[in-house]
């Protein structure tokens, strides 16, 4: 069996960096080199301050960096020396041309394939780590075949990641499963077994699943679509709970005890975010349309539509409760990352909520323990603009949650950081304008509602009626309409 002794990973982001750090940590005899064109990112990986925050990552990196784990911008040499090359580059949703707003943009995958074949000789395994549309491996294979040379043998595998940001190291060390897809040929199966041997250093063999390449690629898209679907499903029930007096947490507990359903991903919130869910579901929608499956495409599109609705609905409740206007009012936004225990803001619901409120003229004071000011400014600015006038005028980045809440009309919790449960809310209430509102978009304050109401707060949360006095936002109850793909930069229609 072919033995993998040197690994190259192209892409030092949220997937490539942690994944290869754990491989190096678990396989001290394998030399792992993570490469990227971004020199500042590589410098950060080689410094005490890593470019991404992930619990446990720093300890893993420091245990093997400089021994069998290396970070470099020398991509060509790393490819030449490697027995296995992971492709772990970004596959964003296309923002132009055919498939705009839905299809995956594979330009970085194509660039990697061309660079790999240019710098390879002999036998080498090339493995997709990035989330890609079905049959992306076939496209890579066609590039390899069109640029073949004597004695070159490149085998293409699919090995999608299933880690969750915030628990990535735990997920990598103790995965539910490892999925490897390859060609159903002797050469393809030889490559599959070689990669299996790497994971078998710490993963039980029964947890390593092998399939054909297409099943592996589709399994990743389907897994993210199913998880997103569950969140949208419970969020749809949260709207019903608010209208009827039911509590979505109690409903989720009741249905989650059914073993056929289970209790995972039944946490109602202001909406899902992150780099994967929306991108992958939209990719699935586009794939279904391209394969002439319009009914299937419409089904999965509803998952995204419900997520968009949940965000708009929450923004509407804020405006509704604050006497139909937030113009020139100070609102504290607690949390900007898309989830706790990460600094990743991609598709964060906090971005959407902030933009909705900014378009109503609200002054936002934003605090997040792990997201730097520069990232918040970029996320709230128009594309291609370093910092637009609206952001300069309406957004302040606070150094701590108490500063953000000082003099605020309302506190809006958008990320479920544990620290928000431990704040001195009596201190916060004293410094806020009255009536003082808390809008808990993540239900992190469940169990504290009576205490907070005793202090004097008006509480609004997802999927439960807490405060009873509310002023209708509009006689019709209509929710402002915003474009799904283009967060609002215009006044809502009411």
Swiss-Prot record:
NCBIfam families reported in the protein's UniProt record: NDP-sugDHase
pH dependence: Optimum pH is 8.6.
Residues that bind NAD(+): 11-16, 36, 41, 89-93, 130-132, 165, 276-279, 346
Catalytic activity annotation: UDP-alpha-D-glucose + 2 NAD(+) + H2O = UDP-alpha-D-glucuronate + 2 NADH + 3 H(+)
EC number(s) on file: 1.1.1.22
Species this chain originates from: Homo sapiens
Region annotation (Important for formation of active hexamer structure) ranges: 321-325
Positions of substrate binding: 161-165, 220-224, 260, 267-273, 338-339, 442
Protein name: UDP-glucose 6-dehydrogenase
Outcome following mutation: residue 255 to T: In DEE84; uncertain significance
The encoding gene: UGDH
Function: Catalyzes the formation of UDP-alpha-D-glucuronate, a constituent of complex glycosaminoglycans. Required for the biosynthesis of chondroitin sulfate and heparan sulfate. Required for embryonic development via its role in the biosynthesis of glycosaminoglycans. Required for proper brain and neuronal development.
Allosteric switch region: annotated segments: 129-135
Metabolic or biological pathway, per its Swiss-Prot or TrEMBL entry: Nucleotide-sugar biosynthesis; UDP-alpha-D-glucuronate biosynthesis; UDP-alpha-D-glucuronate from UDP-alpha-D-glucose: step 1/1
Effect of residue 280 to A: Loss of enzyme activity
Source taxonomy: Eukaryota, Metazoa, Chordata, Craniata, Vertebrata
Region annotated Disordered, chain positions: 88-110, 466-494
Pfam assignment, any one: UDPG_MGDP_dh_N
Documented effect of changing residue 443 to H: In DEE84; uncertain significance
Any one Gene Ontology BP term: chondroitin sulfate proteoglycan biosynthetic process
């Amino acid at each position: 069996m072919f033995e993998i002794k040197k690994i190259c990973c192209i892409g030092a982001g949220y997937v490539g960096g942690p994944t290869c750090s754990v491989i190096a940590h678990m396989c001290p005899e394998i030399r792992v080199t993570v490469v990227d064109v971004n020199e500042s990112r590589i410098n950060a990986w080689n410094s005490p301050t890593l470019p991404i925050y992930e619990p446990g990552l720093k300890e893993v990196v420091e245990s093997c960096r400089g021994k069998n784990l290396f970070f470099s911008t020398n991509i060509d040499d790393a490819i030449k020396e490697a027995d296995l090359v992971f492709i772990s580059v970004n596959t964003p949703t296309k923002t132009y041309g055919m498939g705009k707003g839905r299809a995956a943009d594979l330009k970085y995958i194509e660039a990697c394939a061309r660079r790999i074949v240019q710098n390879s000789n002999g036998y080498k395994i090339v493995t997709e780590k990035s989330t890609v549309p079905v049959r992306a491996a076939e496209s890579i294979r066609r590039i390899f075949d069109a640029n073949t040379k004597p004695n070159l043998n490149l085998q293409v595998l699919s090995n999608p990641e299933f880690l969750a940001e915030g628990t990535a190291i735990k997920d990598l060390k103790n995965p539910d499963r490892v999925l490897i897809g390859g060609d159903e040929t002797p050469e393809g199966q030889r490559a599959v077994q070689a990669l299996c041997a790497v994971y078998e250093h710490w993963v039980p063999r029964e947890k390593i699943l092998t399939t054909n390449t297409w099943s592996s690629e589709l399994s990743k898209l389907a897994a993210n679509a199913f998880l997103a679907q569950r969140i949208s499903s419970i969020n749809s029930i949260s709207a019903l709970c608010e209208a009827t007096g039911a509590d979505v947490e109690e409903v989720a507990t009741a249905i989650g005890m059914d073993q056929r359903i289970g209790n995972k991903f039944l946490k109602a919130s202001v909406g899902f975010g992150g780099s994967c869910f929306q991108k992958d579901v939209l990719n699935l929608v586009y794939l279904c349309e391209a394969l002439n499956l319009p009914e299937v495409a419409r089904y999965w599109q509803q998952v995204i539509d419900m997520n968009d609705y949940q965000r708009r609905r929450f923004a509407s409740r804020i405006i509704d409760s604050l006497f139909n206007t937030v113009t020139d009012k100070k609102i504290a936004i607690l949390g900007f990352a898309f989830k706790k225990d990460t600094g990743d803001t991609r598709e964060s619901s906090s971005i959407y909520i902030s933009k909705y409120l900014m378009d109503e003229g609200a002054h936002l004071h934003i605090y997040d323990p792990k997201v730097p000011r520069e990232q918040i400014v970029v996320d709230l600015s128009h594309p291609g603009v370093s910092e637009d006038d609206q952001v300069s005028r309406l957004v302040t980045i606070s150094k701590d949650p108490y500063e953000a809440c000082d003099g605020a009309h309302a506190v809006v919790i958008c990320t479920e950081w544990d620290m928000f449960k431990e704040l001195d809310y009596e201190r916060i209430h004293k410094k806020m304008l009255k009536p003082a509102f808390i809008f808990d978009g993540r239900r992190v304050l469940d169990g504290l509602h009576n205490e907070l109401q005793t202090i004097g707060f008006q509480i609004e949360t997802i999927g439960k009626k807490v405060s009873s006095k509310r002023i209708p936002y509009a006689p019709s109850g209509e929710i402002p309409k915003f474009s799904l793909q283009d967060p609002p930069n215009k006044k809502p229609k009411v």
